[in-house]
């Protein structure tokens, strides 16, 4: 098995995905939100790239069956039901609902890799579950970091490093240099990831906007034992497909 990591979704094309599993990471916050929503009982999440696309898609659903959710520039979209804060996705709001979801980085990354044979979602909240899934599949795997506004982001590459660390204890594999670098960046800080993530632009911006509790939540390791999976444009837990 070979593990390859891309620092943003902008640097990948369909040829890179052929016959490979893909893990999309957007720890702050899209893949953390989707993982939380599904764990808390959401029926499914439909990621879309644009706000207008989300609104148009919602017209196909009865109003009591869906939620419009997401952000632009880290802020809730006007007229939407939920923002991009995982703390909002509690069972009493999301259970049984279809969530139509659009974000600046994460949902666009998911759309970019949708042609891959298998796409799963990773974050710190489910890092061990993701590593086990990769190990059992025993297929070449591409980790795609969503990044922030098309640029490298600490939170995603450190999560890639956490997956690498968990995978090391499960199976033998080869990897590219960025996968190794993500591991060596992660390892000294594995017990306090905030100590390095605090230097990242994205985390600092979220703090400035008042999302400190979101950050604490998203930096929790192995809170959930589920693996969200994208298939035919819809994300459900892997066992639901």
From Swiss-Prot:
UniProt KW keywords: Hydrolase, Magnesium
Reactions catalysed, as given in the entry: (2R)-O-phospho-3-sulfolactate + H2O = (2R)-3-sulfolactate + phosphate
UniProt cross-references to SUPFAM superfamilies, sorted A to Z: ComB-like (SSF142823)
Enzyme Commission identifier(s): 3.1.3.71
Transmembrane feature ranges: none
Required co-factors: Mg(2+)
Molecular-function GO terms, alphabetical: 2-phosphosulfolactate phosphatase activity; magnesium ion binding; sulfopyruvate decarboxylase activity
Top enzyme category: hydrolase
Pfam families assigned to the protein according to its UniProt record, in alphabetical order: 2-ph_phosp (PF04029)
InterPro entries cross-referenced by the UniProt entry: ComB-like, ComB-like_sf
NCBIfam families: PRK00886.1-3 (NF002054)
Family statement: Belongs to the ComB family.
Stated name of the protein: Probable 2-phosphosulfolactate phosphatase
